[in-house]
Amino acid sequence: MAYSRLVRSLGSLLGRQHPHKMGVTRDMVVALLRYKPKNLVEFRNKLATCTLCIGCMRPGEGAQATSCNLQFDSDFLKGLPAYKDCSSLVVNKRKQDQERKGHWMRFGKSTDPELDLNFQLGLFMDLALTRPSPACAAHQLRGKRCLTCPPLFPKLHKGPGGAWTLHPDPVPSPACVSAMVTAALRMIGVDTAAFSGVCCRMGGLTVATEAGVPETILWMQSGHAQDRAARRYVRLTNPDRLYDTWRAFRL
């Protein structure tokens, strides 16, 4: 006990080295998308990890996401037929937002059906009964979390018959979403000692940067990068460049 107190005292004075973290890689995302979940919890965990990684999201942003934030065929319904079966995920508020509130991440349609994140997210909503509520009023909230629709990655518990169902309080905490990430990585045999929820954003930005996605696009999609005055005035004439972050994963 005396030794433990001494170590804690020295730690408070000298500080502690920040634990090394590794980013979630493209190969891990591919393995998770191909993974056949044994139950609804595994399905949720793998989709949360893939979505956060491709969207370069923080655990807190995943915790705040509701089912109505995921909009299927959003660009297609705007009159752009090339984007059929694609989707947009709205993050209402991101850290250090400048000149706009929130981001719209894009997820394209994969050439390999097993790697189609959009289809799997829709299937999970059907199985978990988390489709957006008909009474959804998110468009009236202007950047606030919808209180009517279920969370995109809800807490689950076992119902009377032993089946996984929505928890009475289904909204997850950031720590809960982080636990989903590490649980998903363990499913594909990853030692999670150097992983946590923040590793999704770290990995997504790494994959995108290595693929040559410009910083301006990363700024528009993830809020990452130093602010440059010109970016505030950019108004893209079509959403194609906003799919670059998703394309970096070659799904």
Enumerate the language-model features and the residues they cover.
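Extended, non-catalytic subsegments within catalytic or DNA/protein-binding/adaptor domains
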Residues: 1-251
